[in-house]
């Protein structure tokens, strides 16, 4: 008695369903609270520095810091001039938007463009309310290595440098992130050393840049998506 031959399954193999790509997790509560703290801190810095700057004088700690940095030796002129040119307000923002758009980082390009418009609009309004002149118009013993007659508070260089560094942060390799943060203090020191800004000018510009990015991060999810921020 012979056993029946085992039946082989000739049906076509079933295709396994492709695994769905993992969904990107929404910002955690800790991250959201960090941006809330950043927004409140930026408002405090901006209001405090604007109130002090509105008397159109340099005195106390600000005056001491200004002379300490502005009196640094002339051999630092070219490094600080290069740092100032690299952070040249509007042009660096336009360059970043173009580069990120060409690299198909459309969301980042849109974020930088929107933050630049918001930052410059805020800077323009506050600058004309505070109406603080540049250090050469406030002091007699200034090393004015670069001449600029526009109003000084807040610094547009400080604002745009802060905006770009914070927006690029999550797109950079981890090893470059902390190094990139050095751009902000390097730019701030260069503006004071060159005699174009007082210390509170760059503090005010930093506060505006931080505040603009914080507001963008704290917008409701649907609004961020409709604005193409997410």
Positions of the model-derived regions?
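Membrane-helix interfacial "entry" motifs
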Residues: 30, 70-77, 81, 100, ...
């Amino acid at each position: 008695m012979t056993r029946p031959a085992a039946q082989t399954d000739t049906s076509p193999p079933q295709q396994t369903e492709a695994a769905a790509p993992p969904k990107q997790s929404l910002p955690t509560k800790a991250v959201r609270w960090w941006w809330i703290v950043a927004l409140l801190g930026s408002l405090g810095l901006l209001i405090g520095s604007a109130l002090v700057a509105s008397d159109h004088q340099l005195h106390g700690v600000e005056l001491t810091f200004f002379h300490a940095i502005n009196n640094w030796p002339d051999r630092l002129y070219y490094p600080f001039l290069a740092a100032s040119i690299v952070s040249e307000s509007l042009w660096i923002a336009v360059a970043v938007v173009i580069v990120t758009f060409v690299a198909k980082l459309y969301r980042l390009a849109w974020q930088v463009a929107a933050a630049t418009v918001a930052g410059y609009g805020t800077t323009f309004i506050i600058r004309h309310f505070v109406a603080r002149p540049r250090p050469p118009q406030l002091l007699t013993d200034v090393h004015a290595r670069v001449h600029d007659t526009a109003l000084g508070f807040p610094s547009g260089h400080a604002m745009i440098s802060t905006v770009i560094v914070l927006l690029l942060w999550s797109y950079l390799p981890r090893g470059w992130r902390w190094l990139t943060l050095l751009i902000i203090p390097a730019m701030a020191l260069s503006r004071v050393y060159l005699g174009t800004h007082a210390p509170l000018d760059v503090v005010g510009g930093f506060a505006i840049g931080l505040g603009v990015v914080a507001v963008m991060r704290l917008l409701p999810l649907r609004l961020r998506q409709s604005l193409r921020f997410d």
